[in-house]
């Protein structure tokens, strides 16, 4: 948290911006947007072996309750408006993780007429998790990278 100084009187001094960002990283609530086989790996990351709940990451069923969206799988042209609508319903500040090669750039179905070549054409993406499908460890690493990015942002100046 980049604590500036610990005083002998028994309290800590820091900036409000750093404290807010530190608290945000401890309670990230992702909205699952599972479209294909990458969603199975996302479910595995929330299951008992990896247990994302211990990191304060609790999957939420509603976009109004979440601040992170994990797009996992092939995004078709028909699902693109739904993705944008769910993204717009999320409260600020919000972040997006693109999981898998299909969500990142179209993947194996890149040349299909009905596939969007990356969900970053519809919503702004903060973290890309590569793989086909990416493992649960890769998703957890992507979430850790997002936490580091959140700590670096300037929240109050937004």
Swiss-Prot record:
Its EC number is 7.1.1.-. It is a peripheral membrane protein. GO terms for cellular component: plasma membrane; respiratory chain complex I. NDH-1 shuttles electrons from NADH, via FMN and iron-sulfur (Fe-S) centers, to quinones in the respiratory chain. The immediate electron acceptor for the enzyme in this species is believed to be ubiquinone. Couples the redox reaction to proton translocation (for every two electrons transferred, four hydrogen ions are translocated across the cytoplasmic membrane), and thus conserves the redox energy in a proton gradient. It comes from Thiobacillus denitrificans (strain ATCC 25259 / T1). This is NADH-quinone oxidoreductase subunit B. It catalyses: a quinone + NADH + 5 H(+)(in) = a quinol + NAD(+) + 4 H(+)(out). It comes from the Bacteria. NDH-1 is composed of 14 different subunits. Subunits NuoB, C, D, E, F, and G constitute the peripheral sector of the complex. SUPFAM superfamilies: HydA/Nqo6-like (SSF56770). Binds 1 [4Fe-4S] cluster. Its cofactor is [4Fe-4S] cluster. Disulfide bonds: none annotated.
